[in-house]
């Protein structure tokens, strides 16, 4: 996981609610970007959920809000994995997650990205989808229930899927 600060006021020592404060962490004061790259394999969704949950705590989300965020991230990852499997073959793509933490909000972008090895891209044929049900649309509609903003795009030429979700802290 890689985090970088993009702008905003400086953080104060002990600001994130470290042990000994006796309460939930104080919400962050600046804007930070964290990037996570994972294999496009269902088993790795847990790592994406852990990152989302931890960053949700940093923003100040309640446990219910974190649960809702985790449901949305899980579904977005499942859609990205399906897009990667269809485009580059099962287990060959990657997921790229960008988390942008700001005061009172967390933005999550999930993308399916091609495998690194060019040889693999040329050798792998896209998997076929035999399902009669459009699981992609069902998943996108489910995500809308748990986030405040959603943008979805799937490039028909490259097969890359991009989903941007925003959840706001509501008090």
Give, region by region, the residue ranges found by the protein language model.
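Generic detector of contiguous secondary-structure segments
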Residues: 52-67, 92-100
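Conserved ATP-binding N-box helix of the HATPase_c
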Residues: 63-90
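Generic hydrophobic secondary-structure packing signal
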Residues: 44-48, 52, 68, 72, ...
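Helix-loop-beta hinge of the Bergerat
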Residues: 29-63
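Conserved beta-strand-loop-beta-strand hairpin that lines the nucleotide-binding pocket
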Residues: 1-35, 81-171
């Amino acid at each position: 996981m890689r985090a970088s600060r993009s702008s905003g006021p400086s953080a104060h020592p002990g600001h994130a609610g470290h042990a000994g404060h006796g309460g939930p962490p104080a919400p962050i004061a600046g804007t930070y970007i964290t990037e996570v790259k994972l294999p496009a394999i269902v088993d790795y969704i847990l790592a994406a959920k852990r990152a989302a949950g931890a960053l949700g705590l940093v923003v100040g989300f309640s446990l219910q809000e974190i649960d809702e965020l985790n449901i949305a991230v899980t579904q977005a990852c499942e859609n990205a994995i399906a897009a990667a499997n269809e485009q580059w073959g099962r287990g060959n793509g990657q997921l790229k997650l960008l988390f942008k933490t700001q005061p009172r909000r967390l933005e999550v972008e999930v993308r399916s990205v091609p495998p690194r090895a060019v040889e693999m891209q040329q050798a792998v044929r896209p998997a076929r989808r035999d399902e009669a049900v459009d699981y992609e649309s069902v998943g996108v509609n489910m995500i809308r229930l748990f986030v405040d903003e959603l943008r979805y795009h799937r490039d028909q030429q490259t097969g890359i899927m991009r989903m941007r979700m925003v959840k706001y802290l509501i008090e």
